[in-house]
Structures are given as structure tokens and as C-alpha cells.
A protein has these predicted regions:
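Accessory carbohydrate-recognition regions in carbohydrate-active enzymes
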Residues: 20-304
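Hydrophobic h-region of N-terminal signal peptides that target proteins for export
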Residues: 9-18
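Positively charged n-region of N-terminal signal peptides that target proteins for export
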Residues: 1-4
């Protein structure tokens, strides 16, 4: 009888340990109140799967700034795919996506939106923020090589999504019949091959009523393809209040075809299913170490 009770207790304890949500202790914003002059961590909110090829982060810094997200900033310029190990080494293969409403603005300064940390949620594999100036809620949850964005728009006849391929050599192409944008960025900070490119594929679940591209700060409505130092693409549509638009994004250092292959990682899962799978993946890694004693702040420091 004692053996049966002991076995039952061990199984129950095991189930409790397995079910524990270790991600509740992780704060991706920890260490982001840093600058060139003073570091409190020199980190950024790296939203990713464990050991993912790509990280995604809200971008408050200017294009090329190693401090791509700082806690004291109050405007977001975009949501960036990043591979940056530290602000001193900087980034490579980066590009961004940003929802805009009302007047069409694609310049990173003019499209930027005020935000508050009160309207921001950051976990290891999920990020959400309210962009006040555009009245858009942006959410993202990644896999190893892909990411699913969920934009909740207001009622507006002029809702847009800007894809910024950044400077130092880039290319974009809008494919309306497939609700798709493809492109590549060559931006880097050294340490890459001469023919380096990060190819990306973006698929939307809403047809475009507006199509345009920009090159070196010049907007060209109706032009579906650009290759220049700094390029980007813009698609638009009218939206109802609370209408959700999804963007499925994947990239590859090999080719457009490989980027499309990587996009299959998202499968047919819903946004919630992908977010849960990301949370489960992090719990599997974080749960390998269980600490005893200490207070909540110490737990947060350890697991972050």
C-alpha cells in the first residue's frame, strides 16, 4: 500500500513539474534600458523559439542602430527580423514590417507610432503592443525560421502595411495575384560572404487594393518591383473595426525557394496554436533547471 501511495505521489509531482509554466518568470524586456554611454544589459526583446534561426523584435532605434530597442523610447518604427548578438557587433540580414493607417507614410521617422509599456506584452515566444497613432494592435509569434503576425485594424479606408528591406542594397517585389511580397536585404556589419543575401517571403490573407514600392525615399505607386540601395514595399486595403489581417513571413540565406519552404513551418496552425507551441518549447528548455528558495525577482533574473 505504501509503495502504491509513494508511486502515486511521484507521478503527481512529476505531472505538476511538467505542467509548470517557467516562461512566467522570463522578462524579455530585462536589460533593455541601455545606451551607448551606459549599459544595463545591452539586450533587446528577442522573440523567438529556442535556438531559432531568426529573432523578431520591436524596433525603436533608427535603421542600423545597434540599440534597436530601448526601454526609455516611446515610439516603435517597425517590427524587425534580427540576428544581432550584441549592439557592438550589430546586425545582419535585417528587414522590418509596420502597419500604418490614415496618411501613407513609409519613412521610418514618419511612420513611427507612440506606444506605452502598459499596452505591451512580451514573453519568449509572443509579443503584443498597441500602436496608438495608428490604432493598430500588433502581435507576433515565431517558429525557428518563420513568424506569424496578427494585426488588428480600426475602421479605416486607408490601412497599410509597410515592408522595409533596409539600405545598403535591397530588392522587393509585390505579387498581388498571390497576396505576396518577396525581397531580399544585403545589409550587414561584416563577417558575411560577398554574395550575402537574406531572402524573405511574406504572404497575407487579405487582397491588396493599394500597391506601391519605394526606392531611396521616393514612393512609386503602382510600381511593383524595386532594386536599389534602400527599397521597400507597401500594400493597402480598407478595414472594418477590429478586422484582423495576418502576415506569414519566412526567410532564407539561400534562395526565395528555400524561404518559401521555410514558410511551411507555420503549417495550418492558428495564431493561438503557434503561440502555445512556442511556449511549450521554451518550457521544455527552461524546465531543465529548477531552483529552490529565493524570491520572485530572483526567479525572474535567473530564468530571464
Amino acid at each position: 500500500m505504501r509503495k502504491i501511495l509513494l508511486t502515486a505521489c511521484l507521478i503527481a509531482c512529476s505531472l505538476i513539474a511538467e505542467a509548470k509554466d517557467w516562461t512566467q518568470y522570463v522578462n524579455p524586456l530585462m536589460g533593455t534600458q541601455s545606451s551607448f554611454e551606459l549599459s544595463t544589459g545591452n539586450t533587446y526583446p528577442a522573440i523567438a523559439r529556442p535556438w531559432g534561426m531568426n529573432f523578431w523584435t520591436p524596433q525603436t532605434g533608427k535603421m542600423g542602430d545597434g540599440w534597436q530597442y530601448t526601454y526609455t523610447a516611446n515610439k516603435i518604427r517597425g517590427f524587425k527580423q534580427t540576428h544581432q548578438p550584441s549592439p557592438w557587433i550589430n546586425d545582419y540580414g535585417q528587414f522590418s514590417i509596420m502597419p500604418v493607417t490614415g496618411k501613407l507614410e513609409f519613412d521610418e521617422e514618419k511612420r513611427a507610432s507612440w506606444f506605452s509599456h502598459k499596452g505591451e506584452i512580451a514573453t519568449p515566444s509572443y509579443y503584443k503592443v498597441y500602436l496608438a497613432e495608428h490604432d493598430v494592435v500588433t502581435e507576433m509569434t515565431p517558429t525557428e525560421r518563420a513568424v506569424l503576425f496578427r494585426f488588428t485594424f480600426p475602421e479605416n479606408e486607408h490601412s497599410y502595411i509597410v515592408v522595409d528591406a533596409f539600405d545598403k542594397g535591397s530588392y522587393v517585389k509585390v505579387i498581388p495575384e498571390e497576396n505576396k511580397i518577396i525581397g531580399y536585404t544585403t545589409r550587414n556589419s561584416g563577417g558575411v560572404p560577398e554574395n550575402f543575401k537574406n531572402y524573405f517571403v511574406i504572404e497575407f490573407d487579405k487582397p491588396f487594393t493599394y500597391k506601391g514600392t519605394f526606392a531611396d525615399k521616393k514612393l512609386e505607386e503602382g510600381n511593383l518591383e524595386q532594386k536599389a540601395d534602400h527599397t521597400g514595399a507597401i500594400i493597402g486595403f480598407s478595414t472594418r473595426k477590429g478586422e484582423i489581417v495576418h502576415a506569414r513571413i519566412a526567410s532564407s540565406f539561400i534562395s526565395f525557394e528555400q524561404a518559401a519552404q521555410n514558410l511551411k513551418e507555420l503549417g495550418n496552425d492558428s495564431f493561438e496554436q503557434l503561440a502555445q507551441k512556442g511556449n511549450d518549447a521554451w518550457n521544455k528548455v527552461l524546465g531543465k533547471i529548477e531552483v529552490e528558495g529565493g524570491n520572485l525577482d530572483q526567479y525572474r533574473t535567473f530564468y530571464s
